[in-house]
Amino acid sequence: MTPTIDLIRLENSFDGGALGALRICKQMFCATLEPADRDNQPDVSCIPAGQYRCRRIQSPRFWDTFEVQHVPGRSHILFHPGNRQVDTAGCILVGRTWGQLSGDRAILNSGNTFERFMIRMKGIDEFVLTITESY
């Protein structure tokens, strides 16, 4: 069974990025961090709210992960570990909780959380991601 995956953006800050929550089958799974909304500019903006198909891929940098597909004007939008907005390059970072690192807004325990995400998604090659904004 393909799970329902929702990303709810909770806060958007040009300095600290877009903080959100990822739900799997309507259950809170983890915190997210994306670049701030900068009109969908490649590498520096979060992608627009909406529905997107995500497909499992083998990334040269992040190995086994999921790519958000068919984003207008964008490509290579991945789920991956990272802590601060500078780590995103337009992608979706996952972490256990929100916090601060060196004075920057961050998500914490990202590596372990990404590993848990991929374990939770074992056997699933595609899913639909619904992104909404609640700010």
Language-model features and meaning:
Residues 1-128, 132-135:
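Cell wall/extracellular polymer interaction/catalysis modules
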